[in-house]
C-alpha cells in the first residue's frame, strides 16, 4: 500500500467519524464512503457524495447535511488543508501537499515493483487470446488482440491477480486438412512431380517453403506410400512448421504464453463426450431431426444450438464447450476470452453453455477486438508494399517499429474500431504518443547521466521537503496515482487507461522540467531532491511502458 492509498483510507475514516458526530449514526450505519478525484483540479484533490447518500436516512437536503458534516471534518486533521461544499452537497477536499514528498523514497525503494498491489487477492484468471488458426500469418486483428491480451495479463498480474496466458491451437478442423493437402501438393512440386493443388488450399509463400522443407527432409520417401501414411506424417510437420512460425512472430512481438493448448488433445484425452454427458445429465440436451441439440434458450440465447449434426459430425460448438469445461476444471475462477469482431454473436451461446454445465455465466468474460484499418498520409493502406498482399503483423512491425505497434494497439478500447495512423506512428515528434512518452523517459535518463558526471547520485536521503513548487506537487500527485490506475485498468480490463496515464505523467514531467531547473550547482540540496523526484518519474514511466510491452529507451 502506497502513501496515496494510506491517505485515502485515513480520509475515509475521518469522514466516517465526522458523519457519526454530525448526523448521529452508529459507525455500522454509515454507508460506504466513496472518494473520487475531480477532473478539474479547482474542485480539490478528492470529492465525496456522502451527503447525498445520507439524505434519505437523515431526512434532510444533501447540502444541509454537508453543512453539518464539514465543521467536524475541519477539526484536527493535518492531512486536510481545506474543505468546501459544492453544488447540491458534494464535499471537496484540498489536502496539504507536504505528504506527497513521502512518495519519493517509497518509489525509489520499490523500483520495478512500484505499482504492484494485492488488489486482486490472488484470484485465478485465465486469459486466452490470439488463438489464430495455424495455417498462415498473423493479421492486424490478431496483432491488436495480442497487444491487448498481453498488456491486460501484465496489468492484472501487477494488480495482484493470478494470471495464466493461453493460446488455443485450432488443430482439429477442416482447415488443417486443407493445410496438409496444400503441403502435400507443394512437396510433390518441390520434387518436380505433377500434383493437383486443392481447391481450398493455402497458396502462401510459407507453404511453398514448407513443401521444399518436406522434400529436403524426406526426399521421395512419401511419393509412393499410401495417402493416409503420407498425410499423417505431413500433418505433424505442417503443424510444427506453422505453430513454430506463430511462436516466433509472437515472441518477437514480446508476447509469450504459459500454455499452448491443442484442440486435438481434447479428443485424444476423451474430453469431448464427457462434456456432452454432463450437459445431458443437467437436463439441457435433446434430440431432434436426427441431431443433438443444446437448449441454450433456457439461458437467454436467441435459439437452441446443434452440437452433433444428423450425419454424426460435431459442430465447432461442442469441442469449444469441452475446452471451456477443461479450463474451469483446471481451477480458474474466471475465464477471459479475447475474440475477433466476427465472434460477437458467439458470446450468448457460450455463456449459456457455461451455465448449462453448472457454472456461473459470470465466470466467462469476453473481450471483442474490433477491426483495424491502416492509414498513411491520410490514405487507407490495404496491401503490403513488400508482398503486395494483405498487411500482416510482421509487415506492420517492419514498417512502424515494434514499440509503436504495441503502444498504438493499446491506445484504444478493444471494442472500438481503430484507424491506425502509420505516418504518426513513424514520426519523431511530440504528436506521436509513444514518442512523447519515451522521450520523457530518455530526457530524464539524460539529466541523471549529467548529474552523475557532476558527482551527483540519486539518494533516498535527500531532503524531500524542499520540493514545494506547484509543478513538483502536480508531478508527485500523478506519480502517486499509478497503483490505483493499474488496479482500475485491471478491473475494467482496459489497457488503454495505462496509455492515458503515461501520457498524463509525461505531460506532468515536461511541465515540471520547463518550469524548474534540476541541475543547479548553486543549490545542491534542492538539486538532490529534484534528481530523486525525476528518478521516481523515470521508474514509473518504465514500469508503465513495461506493462504495455514497450521499451523505455535511455537515449533517443
UniProtKB/Swiss-Prot annotation:
InterPro entries the record matches: aa-tRNA-synth_I_CS (IPR001412), Arg-tRNA-ligase (IPR001278), Arg-tRNA-synth_N (IPR005148), Arg-tRNA-synth_N_sf (IPR036695), ArgRS_core (IPR035684), DALR_anticod-bd (IPR008909), Rossmann-like_a/b/a_fold (IPR014729), tRNAsynth_Ia_anticodon-bd (IPR009080)
Molecular function as annotated in GO: arginine-tRNA ligase activity; ATP binding
Positions occupied by motif 'HIGH' region: 132-142
Reactions that this protein is recorded to catalyse: tRNA(Arg) + L-arginine + ATP = L-arginyl-tRNA(Arg) + AMP + diphosphate
Subunit description: Monomer.
Family designation: Belongs to the class-I aminoacyl-tRNA synthetase family.
Name used for this protein in its record: Arginine--tRNA ligase
Organism: Listeria monocytogenes serotype 4b (strain CLIP80459)
Gene: argS
Amino acid at each position: 500500500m502506497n502513501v496515496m492509498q494510506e491517505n485515502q483510507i485515513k480520509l475515509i475514516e475521518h469522514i466516517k467519524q465526522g458523519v457519526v458526530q454530525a448526523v448521529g449514526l452508529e459507525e455500522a450505519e454509515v454507508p460506504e464512503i466513496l472518494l473520487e478525484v475531480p477532473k478539474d483540479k479547482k474542485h480539490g484533490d478528492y470529492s465525496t457524495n456522502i451527503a447525498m447518500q445520507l439524505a434519505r436516512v437523515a431526512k434532510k437536503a444533501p447540502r444541509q447535511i454537508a453543512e453539518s458534516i464539514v465543521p467536524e471534518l475541519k477539526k484536527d486533521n493535518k492531512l486536510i488543508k481545506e474543505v468546501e461544499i459544492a453544488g447540491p452537497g458534494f464535499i471537496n477536499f484540498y489536502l496539504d501537499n507536504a505528504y506527497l514528498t513521502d512518495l519519493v523514497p517509497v518509489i525509489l525503494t520499490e523500483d520495478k515493483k512500484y505499482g504492484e498491489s494485492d488488489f486482486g487477492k490472488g484470484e485465478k484468471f485465465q486469459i486466452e487470446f490470439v488463438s489464430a488458426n495455424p495455417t498462415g500469418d498473423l493479421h492486424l486483428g490478431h496483432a491488436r488482440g495480442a497487444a491487448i491480451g498481453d498488456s491486460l495479463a501484465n496489468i492484472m498480474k501487477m494488480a495482484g491477480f493470478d494470471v495464466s496466458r493461453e493460446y488455443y491451437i485450432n488443430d482439429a478442423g477442416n482447415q488443417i486438412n486443407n493445410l496438409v493437402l496444400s503441403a502435400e501438393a507443394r512437396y510433390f512440386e518441390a520434387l518436380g512431380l505433377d500434383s493437383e493443388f486443392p481447391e481450398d488450399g493455402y497458396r502462401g509463400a510459407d507453404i511453398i517453403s514448407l513443401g521444399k522443407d518436406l522434400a529436403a527432409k524426406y526426399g521421395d520417401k512419401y511419393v509412393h506410400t499410401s495417402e493416409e501414411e503420407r498425410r499423417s506424417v505431413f500433418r505433424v510437420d505442417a503443424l510444427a512448421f506453422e505453430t513454430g512460425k506463430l511462436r516466433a512472430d509472437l515472441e518477437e512481438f514480446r508476447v509469450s504464453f504459459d500454455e499452448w493448448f491443442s484442440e486435438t488433445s481434447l479428443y485424444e484425452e476423451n474430453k469431448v463426450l464427457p462434456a456432452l454427458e454432463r450437459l445431458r445429465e443437467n437436463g439441457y440436451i435433446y434430440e431432434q431431426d436426427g441431431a443433438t441439440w443444446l437448449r441454450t434458450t433456457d439461458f437467454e440465447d436467441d435459439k437452441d444450438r446443434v452440437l452433433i449434426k444428423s450425419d454424426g459430425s460435431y459442430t465447432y460448438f461442442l469441442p469449444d464447450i469441452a475446452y471451456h469445461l477443461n479450463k474451469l476444471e483446471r481451477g480458474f475462477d474466471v475465464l477471459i476470452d479475447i475474440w475477433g469482431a466476427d465472434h460477437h454473436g458467439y458470446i450468448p451461446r457460450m455463456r449459456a453453455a457455461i451455465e448449462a454445465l453448472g457454472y456461473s455465466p459470470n465466470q466467462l468474460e469476453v473481450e471483442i477486438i474490433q477491426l483495424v484499418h491502416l492509414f498513411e498520409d491520410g490514405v487507407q493502406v490495404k496491401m503490403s508494399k513488400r508482398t503486395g498482399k494483405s498487411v500482416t503483423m510482421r509487415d506492420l512491425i517492419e514498417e512502424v517499429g515494434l514499440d509503436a505497434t504495441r503502444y498504438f494497439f493499446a491506445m484504444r478500447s478493444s471494442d472500438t474500431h481503430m484507424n491506425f495512423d502509420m505516418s504518426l506512428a513513424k514520426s519523431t515528434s511530440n504528436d506521436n504518443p509513444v514518442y512523447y512518452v519515451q522521450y520523457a523517459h530518455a530526457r530524464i535518463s539524460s539529466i541523471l547521466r549529467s548529474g552523475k558526471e557532476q558527482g551527483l547520485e540519486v539518494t533516498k536521503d535527500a531532503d524531500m521537503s524542499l520540493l514545494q513548487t506547484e509543478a513538483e506537487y502536480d508531478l508527485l500527485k500523478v506519480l502517486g496515482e499509478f497503483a490505483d490506475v493499474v488496479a482500475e485498468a485491471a478491473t475494467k480490463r482496459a489497457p488503454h487507461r495505462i496509455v492515458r496515464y503515461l501520457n498524463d505523467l509525461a505531460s506532468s514531467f515536461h511541465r515540471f522540467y520547463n518550469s524548474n531547473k534540476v541541475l543547479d550547482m548553486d543549490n545542491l540540496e534542492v538539486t538532490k531532491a529534484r534528481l530523486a523526484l525525476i528518478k521516481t518519474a523515470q521508474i514509473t514511466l518504465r514500469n508503465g511502458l513495461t506493462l504495455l510491452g514497450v521499451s523505455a529507451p535511455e537515449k533517443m
